[in-house]
């Protein structure tokens, strides 16, 4: 075989030249100056420069004067980390996340008003919109409004909360407000307050909102169900809307490309449990509706990869449990360099659960601004002296706020203690549930996980629609159980202490302590699940010889709350006190004076008219506390049930808690 070199003749060269893609003929009249540049087929009938002139770095057309929040149907700059599309200001074309389960049923939702973003990976820290005025509301969304604001009520005794005493100690305390309109919180916050149907602030909100708006540190003690969450979310979000993202925005942009950049939240809220963290996050969703603030939540027991992906889309307000937050910080996903607001909710519970090392790691041993630069708030139902002393390390010239009988219980809760042997508890429980009917939510507390499963099985086989939660359940199972309970599909929830703290389950009519806790503070938080925000509630506790260690504290608590005290409980408390005293450290002194917590900076012998007279002893003469209750609240359960049932008449016509 021979190899012949064939040279191109002039005719072949001419044919190849005629195939020039940049010739005048094929480019539709393009200028000769553009010769040498390849033009895609779909642009060959346009001007050579059209489609390339005003492009961003990703290659997609992007009008610079176009609002990133109002782009119906336009390409969404996929791959460009600093820009995202909103898919329209109305409902057309908006991504609907119904039926999708993120975070095992909670959290991470692609939602307008919360950082509208595509799931292709766009950052909430967008180049254009974040430089706009953060105080201006974004367009509304009817679907999102329905999702966020479709439940809840103010409670039949909400107006009575005005009688609750309040004491604030500290230098230069700002005056309290009477209505939300008394202080400027901006258009977005006021609009969301109307959507939540809040008619007037609760006592803790009246005092905490102006304190936080005045950029003062705060330690607040308030009874459960008093509106603590809104008390810190409203002023913090209001300040973020007013001040904008500040240096945090620049830090995120300079930190790296999408997928590797660290997020710098402006506000951090720490909570002891994942349930409470999710609850705070859902409240933050409400109050950040139609704003550019994007809340996020991270907690243990859920897919950390999904949480990281959610964080990478941007985070301005972060709600977290301490353990998972430390994990995120060590992974380089969260930086606290520009955190202006720190909130510790249920602070005593976090310390009881052993989170103090993680809290100190977060607050003192990382890059968080020091006290005096950041603004720190502590909220809890109880604040004993030990925790107040710890607060010296986190708070700077703080104001101590005591609202209601902190560490005690609300008089909206009727408490009943009955003697029940262990073998009789299940039959007693059936009697109670049979008298209650199926239209009210009942929360049953037990001490062990095995006991929760066993009792749920028993009630199920007795024909009751019930569910249960405890620490061994997966996050998905726990969320599903809470959803079934809240919706009324399973009106009976059996729970261990994991559900006792901070959960805001509205309309819980009855709390039953099937097993009493060994700690009186745990008892306070358990029964605080009912009677929330002015609603009337009922708490029944099964007592026997196993619970003798809390006899004295329980008696003091019932006396202070003007509840009916069984004679056998008084006798047991007397005998127990004079036969060697209470086993373990008595905590009854925490409830003296009506509030249960005092500012340790004040003299231990001082008193305040806001607290009422100190009880001093277990006398039932009515010292301390608040309200104008007569005797022990008018006898019985005030008509909750129409059955004689057990331990007294449930339909007593005596004087109610408010003297009616």
Curated annotation (Swiss-Prot):
Modified residues (N-acetylserine): 2
Residues bearing PTM Phosphoserine: 85, 89, 101, 129, 454, 592, 603
Domain Helicase C-terminal: 412-573
One Gene Ontology cellular component annotation held by this UniProt entry: cytosol
SMART domains per the UniProt record, alphabetical: DEXDc (SM00487), HELICc (SM00490)
Biased composition (Polar residues): 15-29
Biased composition (Basic and acidic residues): 1-10, 44-68, 93-128
Positions with biased composition (Low complexity): 603-620
Residues the record lists as N6-acetyllysine modifications: 55
Residue positions, PTM Omega-N-methylarginine: 100, 109, 590, 615, 630
Main localization (coarse): cytoplasm
Motif window: DEAD box: 345-348
Localization, UniProt: Cytoplasm; Nucleus
List of residues binding ATP: 198-205, 222-229
Protein role: Probable ATP-dependent RNA helicase. May play a role in spermatogenesis.
Name of the featured protein: ATP-dependent RNA helicase DDX3Y
Source organism (scientific name): Pan troglodytes
EC number of the protein: 3.6.4.13
